[in-house]
Amino acid sequence: MLHLNYDITHLRGAEYNPRFIGEDDLARLAESVRELGLVKPLIVRGDLLVAGHQRTKALRKLGITRAAVYVLPCETTVYDEVRFNQLHNGTDFDSGDERCRVSGLEDKHGFVQVSASQISGNMRAKMAYVRKNIAELVIKYGPWGGCVATQSGEVIHCAQYALAAKMTRTPLTVFVIPDVEKEKYQSYLNKTYGVFEYSHLEKTTYIQTYAQLMRLRNGGSLKSNLYESLSLPIIAKTPRGIDFGSGQGDYARMLRAKGYNLHDLELFRRKGAGNTLDRAATNRMIDTLVDDLKTRGRYDYVICDSVLNSVDSVEAEWSVLTVLKGLCKAGGSIFFSGRSRGELETVLKQTQAASSKSRLYFIDHNGFTALYRKGHWFYQKFHSDDEVKQLCRVHGFRIKRSIFNCKSWYLHVINDDSLSWASLEKAVRFEFELPLPGGSTIGRSDDVLAAFRPLIK
């Protein structure tokens, strides 16, 4: 239910708020609120502020204690509350082709509610997945959002929400402004205040293992593009290799059966298709790694498929790449892959939400997305082409061959000899002491470092 004069003094922010705002942006947002008022309702459940954290900070900075609030009519899930938070901010960014209008506003001012029949617009506008996600929450929880429109009916802010209201045939909350103030409102509303930020959220890295694919089972329909396009045409049976982060290990198992000297290591190997970690298998793989390094040295090539898109922090990304560098001898080959930021842009450009799956991502300034499911945060990392190339420069990788497309990227790089012991030690401590369910850790960093020590000057 919408309340236009709700007491906000008792509201507490959700711990999972995935939005960060610095002091400069907060000051600019406060100026916007002072000049325009609060044009979009906050979203509340009980005394919990579900969405609108930064606007509430701005209101309190200005000493304002009452504001427009939409109170959710029923219990929610944390998953939905996070989606509210993301969409409450995400709807600020319209695609520009909505051509959305609302009739009957000529004598209105401030907040009003209109029927869906008064809304018109381009229902084939871009950002179809934004509308789909908004509509799902509207159907479950009622008309929680709003838009800004002129008295002549032009929607100038949050047009995607207005189109979703028309889709779902639900009432639309509109903040109506005089036509002469359109330019002023747009100058404030089109600015970005704060950024998505997921670094403070809980990390249970072993959860990422649930994304492991059975690559060569079920008819081999999930083959690895990195293996098929870059690795297999180059690696020979004689040199030694290792697949780091091998998931279920299908490719390594298949190639060993064909005579390849290819070890593999997965720190969170699952037992079959279940969700239980096979800690004994992981320890056996680490034992083999330690013995291999001690008796034969570093590897001629290293493969790391779809690991960098599953890291959950900048530190984890650095650690993975540094361990790859340590595993591969100087002059050897490293093959690795990840997901492209272009995939996000492609989704936002789509005019129809054809898939039943949620494909909408809100990316933070480090390239991470976060999805809350089953009590845990799941992360994905997306890279631009330039970011991938910069990672190679930082880690001393010379790109020999690269494949970049709108969804993924794949690299074959040549390793140099610039690795320091201090860097490798830090990375190994991170990777081989990652937490496990129940509060324990992998606990094998000392063994791995002892094997590496004679090999790194």
Task: Label each residue range with its predicted role.
Residues N309-S313:
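A short His-aromatic
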Residues A30, R256, L321-K325:
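A structural alpha-helix within SAM-dependent methyltransferase catalytic domains
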Residues T238, Y299-D300:
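Local beta-strand N-terminus motif with an aromatic residue
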Residues I303-S306:
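A conserved beta-strand element that flanks and buttresses the S-adenosyl-L-methionine
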Residues R83, S120-M127, L172-L293, S333-K457:
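Class I (Rossmann-like) S-adenosyl-L-methionine-dependent methyltransferase catalytic domain
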Residues W318-S333:
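A short glycine-rich, Lys/Arg-flanked "PGG" loop and its adjoining helix->strand segment in the class I
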Residues M1-I177, E181, Q186-G194:
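Short, charged/polar connector segments at secondary-structure boundaries
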